[in-house]
C-alpha cells in the first residue's frame, strides 16, 4: 500500500482514539446534574365512620405547630372506637401510636397505640380505642404517629366525641346528594332542596342551590368520576355540620382526548327530627391543564377551560412568553418557539393520584424573560420531591434555555398551608438581583438567595399601616407607632430596594390606602379632625385621596379626589375601580354616608396578554389568555423541566411566632381571610357562612348560636360610678357582671377609655373590639354569656344582654332597667352611633 495513503489513515485513527478518550474523561467530570422529581413515598391515613371514609390525612415528616393545624374533624361515637386504614404504598410501618391534645396544645389529654392491627397488600387496618375522657361536643387535636425505619411520620386532625347520630346522617345525605347529581332521575330528589333560580346560569365552575337543576346535574358536560371520593367533616356543632367531598372527573374533548377536572363539593347541613335541611351546597369545577392536549383555540388563544377568572399569570416584556398557574402547576408557553413547558408540577406522568394531586400548595410567579426563564415561588405542603411531607416556601429559578429548575432557597414552616398562605400571601417578591422579600410574623424580610441570610427591614407591621401592590413590587407603610398620626409614608420599590418618602402637607396626617394596578393610593386627614371617640376607637376622616404614579420612580400625581359631601372613611379596589366609602359627622360621631367611585378607563388597554372568556353549550363559560399576537397550533412541542441536583440543602430559617393576635376566617377547611381586626373577620365569616378562630384555635365567632337568650340578670353599676355618664356606667355594669367591682370613672379620669378599662380589668378574658358589626353579628357573644357594650350616641351606651327571634334585650344603665327593641330598630339605633361595640370571651 502506498505510504502516502497509510499515513493519513494512521493519523486519523490516532485522532479518533484521542477524541474517544477525551470524551470519556470529560463525561466523567460532567455528569448529568439534573433529575426528575422524586416520587411520593409517604402513606395516607384514612378514618372511617360506619363504612364511609370521613378523613384522608397526609403525612408530615417533622412536628407541626398544633395551634396552626386546623383542617378536618373526625367524629367519635359513644363506642369511642376509631377505625383507620393506612395505604402504605410499600412503606414499611413498624408502629402506630396516637396522641390527643387540647387545641391550644397546653395539655396532653391521652396517648396510646393502635390495636387490632392487620396488614394485607400494602394496606394496614387498625383501631384506636379512645379512653373515656373526652368532653362531648368538645374539640381536640389528634396526632397519629407512624414509625417507619428511623423516622416518624405525623398526621393531624381535630377530634370530637359527638352527642348524637347526626354526623352519620349528614354524611350519608351528602353522599346521596352527590350521587344524584350524576343520575338521570335527579329531579326526584334534588329540587326539594333548591332555592329560587337566581344564580349565574352561564358557568359550571361554580354551582350552588340558586343555579338551575341542569347546572347542578352537570348540564351537557357528562363527566365520569375517576378514583376514590375524599370526604371530610370541616365543622361539627349543635346547629349544623359542614362536609366537603373532593374528587376528579374526566370528559372527552372535541378531539377525543381525555380532559381532567378537580371537583370540590361543600355541604352545610342541619338534621332535625323531621327532615334534613340543606343550608348550603356549593360545587367548584376546575380543569387540569394538559399540555399534550390541543389548547390553542381557533382564534389563536390559550384555552384554560372551565375555571375561575382569577388567573395567576405573567408575561415577558414583548408578550411572547407567558407563564401561568393552573391547579397547582406552573406552565410556560413560548409563542415564537412554539413550545409549551410543564415547569413545575407534583402530578406524576403515570396519572392523577391522591398524593400527587393534594391541593395544599400554590405558586406565585415573580418574573418571566424573553428566553423563557422564570423566577417563581412554591409555598405550602410539598406532595413529593426533596421536601416531601414538609410545609414551606421554595424560591426557584427556571432556565428557559436548558429547561431546568433550581431551588435557590427553602424556608421550612411548622404551620398548615392555609395559615402559611394567609401569612405569606400578603407579599412574596423576587427581584433580578436574587433578593426574596416576604412578610412573616408582622415583619418584612429580605433574603439574599446566594447568601441565604434573612434580614428584617420593617417590624411590628399592622394591617392598617401598610399596603402592597398587585405585582408585590411596591410596599408602602407608616411606622406602626404612628398609626393614624403619621406625616410620612415610606414607599419601597422592591425591584431595587429604593425608598421614597411621601410627606404630608402642613396640618395633615396621611395613611396608605392601597394600589390600583401599580399606582399608589393614599389619603390625608386634617390633624384636628382625627379623633378618639368616647369608646376609645380612632376615627380618621380623610379630606382627600391621592393616586400616585410609581412607574420608573416618577412619583407624579395622577389624580386627587375630594368628596363633594362628607369625608373618606375607607376604600376598596376591584379590577380597575376604586370604591370610596364615605362617612359624615352626626351628633358628634361619624356614620356611613354612601359611596363614590373612581374608574381607570385606560384599564388593561396596554396589556400584551389579557384574560378573556367564551360561552359554549357544552362547557358554558371557559377562560382564555388572549394574546395580541397569535400562535400556531399545528406544531407545538411539549417539554417537561428537570430539577438541578443540589450538593447541599438550601434551607433558610425564619422565625414565625405571631407577635400579636390574629384571627382566621375558615370556610370548608380553607382560610378565606386572616386579619388582626376581629370585626373585619366577623363580617367576612358572616358573608361566607364561615367561622372565626384565634391564634390558639379557639372559636371567637360563628353563625351558630342559641335560638334565644334570656336577658342577663344581676346587672348593676358600681356605687362610685352612678353619677357618671352612661358610657362609664355601662362599662361598670359589665365589669360588675364579670365579678370586678372597680371604679370605672377613676380609670377613665386617669386617661383611660372604655376599651382600655375593660382590657386592663378582664385580664383572664379575651377583650374584643367588634365595632363595625351588625346586631345579628354581635349576638353570638350574648349567646356565650357575655354582655356587649354598645354606643348609642356621642356619650351614651347600653349593654346588649339577651335576644329572641325578633328582638334584643338591653340594659340601660341610666334607668337601671332592661328593655327591648326589634332587630331593625336596634340596628338603626346602633348604626347612627357608628356601630361601636366591645365584648369579651372567657379564655
Language-model features, listed with the residues they occupy:
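N-terminal Sec-pathway targeting helices
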Residues: 1-16
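Surface-exposed, charged secondary-structure patches
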Residues: 13, 17, 21, 25-31, ...
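Core segments of small alpha/beta cavity-forming domains
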Residues: 36-99, 103-108, 142-220, 296-339, ...
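Beta-propeller fold detector
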Residues: 110-113, 281, 340-349, 404-413, ...
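A short hydrophobic beta-strand element
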Residues: 140, 235-249, 372-378, 520-525, ...
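Exposed beta-sheet edge and beta->alpha loop/turn motif
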Residues: 240-278, 282, 812-814, 820
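Short loop/turn segments that connect beta-strands within beta-propeller blades
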Residues: 335-338, 399-401, 448-452, 493-497, ...
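Conserved active-site-adjacent core of cysteine acyl-enzyme catalytic domains
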Residues: 710-843
